[in-house]
Amino acid sequence: MTKRLLILEDGTIFEGEPFGADIDVTGEIVFNTGMTGYQESITDQSYNGQILTFTYPLIGNYGINRDDYESISPTCKGVVVSEVSRLASNWRKQMTLDAFLKIKGIPGISGIDTRALTKIIRQHGTMKATMADDGDSIQHLKDQLRATVLPTNTIEQVSTKTAYPAPGIGKNIVLVDFGLKHSILREFSKRQCNITVVPFNITAEEVFQLNPDGLMLSNGPGNPEDLPEALDMIRGVQGKIPIFGICMGHQLFSLANGAKTCKMTFGHRGFNHAVREIATGRIDFTSQNHGYAVERSSLPDTLMVTHEDINDKTVEGVKHRDFPAFSVQFHPDAAPGPHDASYLFDEFLEMIDSWRCTSK
């Protein structure tokens, strides 16, 4: 059987068995520490352009089902596992992980020492990597990898091109799609909200034409500093209607208010990250997927930190002192992961009710 190579930007080479699509790819290599939820992770648009390493030793044993998609068209570049299950056993499964990746054009590699790979990423940071068959010249692949410039328009690639509705009978929410997870829509649907999903480059004027009760800023991939138009939109909306941001939305909300963001060494990607709510001391276990973070020292007086990571004190949530607006770095929608923080959707809707009363 043909072997598949994983070549890192620092020159490290791993050899493994191929599965999924039979193509060569290059992307940023990252790791996810979740024990389950590989379908949600692979279909999460926040992994756009990235080669996704799973640290859990066996991936694929329950297959792929129709209910756990976070997007219909996944855009991660590749999947790296220690061992892939070629058979799937679950009453909901429709196909194996191998078959799914073949259909979606995503290559995979198994038989990799993912512990060693993760250690490299932790020590040296995320980096470019190439996944290719071993019939190719290794030196040629290394030269190509060094010369590759990864794209920066990742959100433009995954955001909806046109607005569309997710009807409900409750509050009107405009949801800006920076790489939207379907689980966010499901959380609002549970609460009967009337949602309009809009492209990433919508203007403040276009937002108000939709007569919203609140603005939701979704998750998404890439560097938040690449979206100056989104910052202008947020500044034009805040103070007029409540705002809630998640992940990329959190970073954009912070930038729009004068804070700075920085690229993390290896990021937070997994479903077991403990976060402290500063006001109450409450500890929530959260789902996270981000390679950038808000710099605490850069926060203006108008923003207060509401949540922080237990382990490294990363800013995990902020709230505006003057306007009805807040954001969190983690995913309260979970999917996959714990639902400890799903109450934040209720707090957003309660904020809308309070704002209606005070603004009359």
From Swiss-Prot:
Q: InterPro entries in the record, alphabetically?
A: Anth_synth/Amidotransfase, CarbamoylP_synth_ssu, CarbamoylP_synth_ssu_N, CarbP_synth_ssu_N_sf, Class_I_gatase-like, CPSase_GATase1, GATASE
Q: What is its EC number?
A: 6.3.5.5
Residues of the active site are: 247, 331, 333
Protein's GO biological process: 'de novo' pyrimidine nucleobase biosynthetic process; 'de novo' UMP biosynthetic process; glutamine metabolic process; L-arginine biosynthetic process
**What does the record give as its pathway?**
Amino-acid biosynthesis; L-arginine biosynthesis; carbamoyl phosphate from bicarbonate: step 1/1; Pyrimidine metabolism; UMP biosynthesis via de novo pathway; (S)-dihydroorotate from bicarbonate: step 1/3
Check the record and name the PROSITE patterns matching this protein: GATASE_TYPE_1
Q: Which residues bind L-glutamine?
A: 46, 220, 222, 248, 251, 289, 291-292
GO molecular function terms noted in the UniProt entry: ATP binding; carbamoyl-phosphate synthase (glutamine-hydrolyzing) activity; glutaminase activity
Q: Which reaction does it catalyse?
A: hydrogencarbonate + L-glutamine + 2 ATP + H2O = carbamoyl phosphate + L-glutamate + 2 ADP + phosphate + 2 H(+)
Q: Which domain of life is it from?
A: Bacteria
Q: Where is this region: CPSase?
A: 1-169
The record, for SMART domains, names: CPSase_sm_chain
- Residues of the Glutamine amidotransferase type-1 domain: 172-358
Q: Could you tell me the keywords of this UniProt record?
A: Amino-acid biosynthesis, Arginine biosynthesis, ATP-binding, Glutamine amidotransferase, Ligase, Nucleotide-binding, Pyrimidine biosynthesis
Q: How does it assemble?
A: Composed of two chains; the small (or glutamine) chain promotes the hydrolysis of glutamine to ammonia, which is used by the large (or ammonia) chain to synthesize carbamoyl phosphate. Tetramer of heterodimers (alpha,beta)4.
Q: Which family is this protein grouped under?
A: Belongs to the CarA family.
Role description: Small subunit of the glutamine-dependent carbamoyl phosphate synthetase (CPSase). CPSase catalyzes the formation of carbamoyl phosphate from the ammonia moiety of glutamine, carbonate, and phosphate donated by ATP, constituting the first step of 2 biosynthetic pathways, one leading to arginine and/or urea and the other to pyrimidine nucleotides. The small subunit (glutamine amidotransferase) binds and cleaves glutamine to supply the large subunit with the substrate ammonia.
Known PANTHER family for this protein? CARBAMOYL-PHOSPHATE SYNTHASE SMALL CHAIN, MULTIFUNCTIONAL TRYPTOPHAN BIOSYNTHESIS PROTEIN-RELATED
User: What protein name is recorded for this chain?
Assistant: Carbamoyl phosphate synthase small chain
Taxonomy of origin reads: Bacteria, Bacillati, Bacillota, Bacilli, Lactobacillales
- Encoding gene, per UniProt annotation: carA
